């Protein structure tokens, strides 16, 4: 089971198995799972079973990689069951691919939000079309931006992520600037940065082993983060770059805390603040 860090204390219920796309070149998360959507009855049965051992559930996260792909009428039945079984629940969240948002009408999105789904986790990865093609994201930057904008208009809280180092040294600046532009247009409620780490089992790892891909070092990753922060205009977005994969930890609110975070990056780049050793980085 994979979940966002902020769902550490949530009840996790499997709505789908695996990821509906499952072809991103950097990802190993669901490679051993054949994607399928669990029956509505089984999901509701799991909720009822969880009620038996949980005295109070404030948050529920529906796994796996693209639970929002489920048909709207099915999710509405599950949302009604959540309200019946866990009336104390304050937040329901799940991962959402661009496709899973775009195939739904505005009325469907509003109905799903109104029924209780509060937060959608979305992966931008990069705003650079060349990078998105290279990593086989399965969506263009414009499609991802539109999906985020439509989700926001429907009332969802949107938590967006991107990945430092995806473009290598040669494409770093373009990746950073295009990602900053995409974030500025989407204006997510939350935006988090991870740093690329290659694991056996993903195509980018195979490229690395074959000598066709050179991962960026800490200086390039930090410069990339700096360019993003300099170019993002998303007032009020909660920004986090404190994932275990990152070389330094940053957190703040855009645009208010941007100058401070830029200074923290500069301190690390100049050697006045520590940079995480490779041995301590984790996914």
Model-derived features: where do they sit?
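Canonical Radical SAM [4Fe-4S] cluster-binding loop centered on the CxxxCxxC motif
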Residues: 2-42
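Conserved, mostly hydrophobic/aromatic
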Residues: 19, 27, 43, 62, ...
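Conserved SAM/AdoMet-binding glycine-rich loop
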Residues: 51-153, 233-234
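Conserved strand-turn element in the central/C-terminal portion of the radical SAM core barrel
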Residues: 99, 127-131, 151-175, 194-200, ...
């Amino acid at each position: 089971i994979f979940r966002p860090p902020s769902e550490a204390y949530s009840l996790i219920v499997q709505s789908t198995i695996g990821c509906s796309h499952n072809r991103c070149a950097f990802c190993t998360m669901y490679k051993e799972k054949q994607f399928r959507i669990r029956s509505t009855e089984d999901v509701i049965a799991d909720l009822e079973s969880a009620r038996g051992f949980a005295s109070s559930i404030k948050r529920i996260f529906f796994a796996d990689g693209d639970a929002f792909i489920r048909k709207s009428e099915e999710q509405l039945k599950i949302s009604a069951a959540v309200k019946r079984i866990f009336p104390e629940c304050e937040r329901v969240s799940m991962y959402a691919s661009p496709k899973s948002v775009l195939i739904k009408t505005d009325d469907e999105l509003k109905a799903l939000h109104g029924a209780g789904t509060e937060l959608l986790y979305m992966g931008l990865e990069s705003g650079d079309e060349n990078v998105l093609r290279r990593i086989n994201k399965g969506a263009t930057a414009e499609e991802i931006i539109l999906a985020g904008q439509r989700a926001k208009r429907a009332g969802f809280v949107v938590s967006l992520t991107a990945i430092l180092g995806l473009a290598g040294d040669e494409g770093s600046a373009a990746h950073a600037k295009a990602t900053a532009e995409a974030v500025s247009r989407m204006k997510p409620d939350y935006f988090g940065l991870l740093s690329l780490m290659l694991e056996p089992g993903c195509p980018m790892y195979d490229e690395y082993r074959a000598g066709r891909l050179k991962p960026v070092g800490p200086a390039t990753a930090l410069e990339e983060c700096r360019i993003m922060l300099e170019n993002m205009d998303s007032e009020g977005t909660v920004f986090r770059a404190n994932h275990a994969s990152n070389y330094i930890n940053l957190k703040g609110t855009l645009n208010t805390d941007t100058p401070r975070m830029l200074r923290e990056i500069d301190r690390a780049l100049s050697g006045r603040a520590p940079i995480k050793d490779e041995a301590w980085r984790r996914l």
